[in-house]
Amino acid sequence: MANSSSSTITIPNFQLQHITHLRDYIPQAQTHPNPLAFNPYFQTFPGFFLSQTDIVLRHNALDLSGTFPTPTPPLAYTRAGPRNRIFFNPTHVHAAVVTCGGLCPGMNTVIRELVVGLWELYGVHEIFGIKAGYRGFYSYEPVKLNPKMVDDWHKRGGTVLETSRGGFDLQKIVDAIQNHGFNQLYIIGGDGTMRGAVEIFEELKRRKLYISVVGIPKTVDNDVGIIDRSFGFQTAVEMAQQAINAAHVEAVSAVNGIGLVKLMGRSTGHIALHATLSSRDVDCCLIPEIDFFLEGKGGLFEFLEDRLKEMGHAVLKAEKDESGNPVFLDVGVWLKSELKNWWSRDHPNELFTIKYIDPTYMIRAVPANATDNSYCTLLAHSAIHGVMAGYTGFVCGPINGNYAYIPVDEVAKAKNKVDTRDHRWSWVRSVSNQPDFIKC
């Protein structure tokens, strides 16, 4: 209950989302004491081990007036962390780690921390890396991993295990998992990879196999839903600053200069939004969530003409599709062409320069920065604790700053688009003074 001077408001009960446990379909699953209780580096004070009563709320800010609806009842998730009893004997664990899809800063850090965490926290020594994504389960021999081997992987970009797109053959993958004797699967990838993880989880459950599956969501453009952010995003925003700085220098160094930067973003504009707020050098931020037009009152050309008259230069930023999928227009190349045609048509005798920068691969191929490295460690350890506790078919990630376990099928379906009604988009427009692109 929430009390005020004039009334009493009833806060609704919360609905705890179910995370599948091995005991749901293997009732005879045995438990073991958590070795962390005997680890000299940990002080297992009261509350150190979590239970089913520890939850994380999906929404920690509710509009009780009903103006902005929230799910009824509001959702809650199981809190991530170690449990007092575990459902795997560490000496019997055979863990597999796989990376799928495109590159993202922090992939190697997650691999490293999974290996070190399993080894040092739980005494698991049979840890294997799967090469080249999902197809690696049935096409390549697993690579034995240990802490010494992965010691400096967090300093490298990309993924040492290598990755690929496609190659998802459910029966071949699950058969290979059985044949190799894996009983823990750590799957690192984006939304497509998580959809594959759902199928693997369902097939393992159908076969009633004692195997836990956890997804660690990866997408550099931060389009994974439910969780606060995906790993690598902070690094991507930081690297985007270099491209913006270069575009700004090029623009101010020319007469009527325009710097055009195309950033990654598969139908979401999070990198562009945050990079704009961080740099303060961007005059117009174009994101997929907002339609814009070129000609006429309130259009992009009118805005740029005014900005060039006032400042003598402008910096534009747009987002593109990460996957390179041909159904997505290459907005950067198209916009560069349209800008050149506009200027030559309307100002044929005036100087004009446009410098186009596409830092896509620079952004996604670099090592994780300090913030993302720390984040990747927490994600990896949260995944390990959940799997050792017997949970399966889940994703780990922060919700409102608290780490939680989320059903993998929910994450596979959820999207995280920029909410243009949110105050952050208003901040972008206040920084850039750009039009709202509403036709008059």
Language model segments and positions:
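N-terminal low-complexity/intrinsically disordered extensions
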Residues: 1-98, 109, 120-126, 132-135, ...
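Short glycine-rich or small-residue beta-strand-to-loop segments that form or flank ligand, phosphate
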Residues: 94-104, 159-162, 183-189, 215, ...
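Short, ordered loop/turn segments at secondary-structure junctions
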Residues: 100-102, 129-135, 165-166, 190-193, ...
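Short glycine/serine/threonine-rich phosphate/pyrophosphate-binding segments
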Residues: 104-114, 137-138, 168-173, 191-199, ...
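Accessory alpha-helical/coil subdomains and C-terminal extensions
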Residues: 176, 187-189, 195-204, 208-210, ...
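A glycine-rich phosphate-binding loop feature that marks nucleotide/adenosyl-phosphate handling sites
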Residues: 260-267, 358-361, 397-404, 409
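Active-site pocket-lining segment
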Residues: 347-365
